[in-house]
Amino acid sequence: MNIRPLHDRVIIKREEVETRSAGGIVLTGSAATKSTRAKVLAVGKGRILENGTVQPLDVKIGDTVIFNDGYGVKAEKIDGEEVLIISENDILAIVE
């Protein structure tokens, strides 16, 4: 992938979600929810603080994260893959 996010932006790829219920029923349409877990593909250099210094991001390439899938999440197709561009503020947790 040949893309570099700016500042505190992070590029992530949503993980696949299980499409069967606990009872074995195949979920489709609105019943199949989108995963809020994703793999970090690229990170910006960091948040620029008021004094001009750059605060590095807490996430790194390869991390699995849980993110807030709402306003401010930008979906893009890059190299044929759908990725999301989000601010680090939209990342709720790193899965360890």
Swiss-Prot record:
InterPro entries: Chaperonin_GroES (IPR020818), Chaperonin_GroES_sf (IPR037124), Chaprnonin_Cpn10_CS (IPR018369), GroES-like_sf (IPR011032). Gene3D superfamilies: GroES chaperonin. It is found in: Cytoplasm. Keywords: Chaperone, Cytoplasm. Heptamer of 7 subunits arranged in a ring. Interacts with the chaperonin GroEL. Together with the chaperonin GroEL, plays an essential role in assisting protein folding. The GroEL-GroES system forms a nano-cage that allows encapsulation of the non-native substrate proteins and provides a physical environment optimized to promote and accelerate protein folding. GroES binds to the apical surface of the GroEL ring, thereby capping the opening of the GroEL channel. This is Co-chaperonin GroES. The lineage of its organism: Bacteria, Pseudomonadati, Pseudomonadota, Gammaproteobacteria, Pasteurellales.
